[in-house]
Amino acid sequence: CLPAGPLRELIRPALKSAQFVVIIGDDLHHITKKYDYDNLEFYNANIKAVDVLDKKRYFAFSGIGNNDGFFDTLMNKGYDVKKKKSFPDHYQFTRKDLESLLDKAKIENLSLITTEKDYVRIPEDYRKNIDCFKIKLEIPNVEKLIRKLIN
């Protein structure tokens, strides 16, 4: 299992040591056809929003490995994203960053939204002004995958 995306491990060497691959969303890169190794099992998964937030106009921001993926997910789930701001992966938001985001959102009458991963790194006194986009993965045949992980 490997994360795929920018600045991640190359697929071919990673798959040689992997036992299974979880493909999130559509197999746009045709991984299952290109890399047919005997030792690999492929599982598909879909991202589901845990809570559907109120219909608002959003200013989305994140500091994860694939910020554009987060923004695309929001829009694909029907969120009205008017503005976006990307930070580096694992970014530690400063109070100055958060004040700037809040000011920009207020000027344009937007609500701030970020990933759950980023939300937990934000000081608590700012969280009340920021919506958290929580997701879960739905994996058909998850029991088979769990057995594979245990064995």
Predicted regions and their residues:
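Residue-level signal for inorganic ion chemistry
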Residues: A18, G63, L112
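Redox- and metal-dependent alpha/beta enzyme cores, enriched for Fe-S-associated oxidoreductases
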Residues: L53-R95, R147
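Phosphate/Mg2+-binding loops and adjacent switch elements
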Residues: C1-Y35
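Short, charged/polar "capping" segments at the starts of alpha-helices
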Residues: D27-K34, D68-G69, Y119-P123
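A short, acidic, amphipathic alpha-helical segment used as a generic capping/interface helix at domain edges
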Residues: Q92-L110, K117-D118
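Short, flexible loop segments at boundaries between secondary-structure elements
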Residues: P88-Y91, K128-N151
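Short, conserved loop/helix-junction motifs that constitute active-site signature segments
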Residues: I11-S17, D36-Y37, L53, K106, ...
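Conserved beta-strand/loop subsegment of P-loop NTPase cores
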Residues: L15-G25, N39-F59, V81-S86, F133
